[in-house]
Amino acid sequence: MLEAFARFTVRLHEQGICHEDFNQTNILWEYDGTAGNYRFQLIDINRMRFHARPLRPDECMINLRRLSCPAVPFLYILDRYADIRGWDINDTLLRGTFFRLLFGRRQQFKKRFRERKSAAAGKKQG
């Protein structure tokens, strides 16, 4: 399934399609036993952007960073993605991991900020 998902994502990016909220909750899939393949669909399509060119490598990695799957499947997807695109696998793994870590840190920072803001608002009311 991850191999098929990597191929699906490559096709999107090569066609200049970027889903700004590319995560598991916005990706539907089903296995077609007759054809022996997976089919994927995107939802929440109001967050999609269409470019007249394929996405640049950093744009692709930034788009993939939102996948909140465990590390091993994420790295496998990056590996297959790089192989399908003909990119250097180690470079793709490094870039993808870097952007994912930055995204995770940003999410943690935002969560802590909201918690502190809520705590401060609670003290003012009390």
Regions found by a protein language model. Name each.
Residues 38-117:
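C-lobe/activation-segment region of protein kinase-like
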Residues 21, 31, 49-51:
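Activation segment
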Residues 22-27, 70, 74:
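Positively charged, low-complexity, intrinsically disordered RNA-binding extensions
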Residues 117-126:
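An acidic, Gly/Ser/Thr/Pro-rich helix-cap/linker signature
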Residues 26-42:
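Conserved protein kinase catalytic/activation segment
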Residues 1-20, 25:
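Conserved kinase catalytic-core helix
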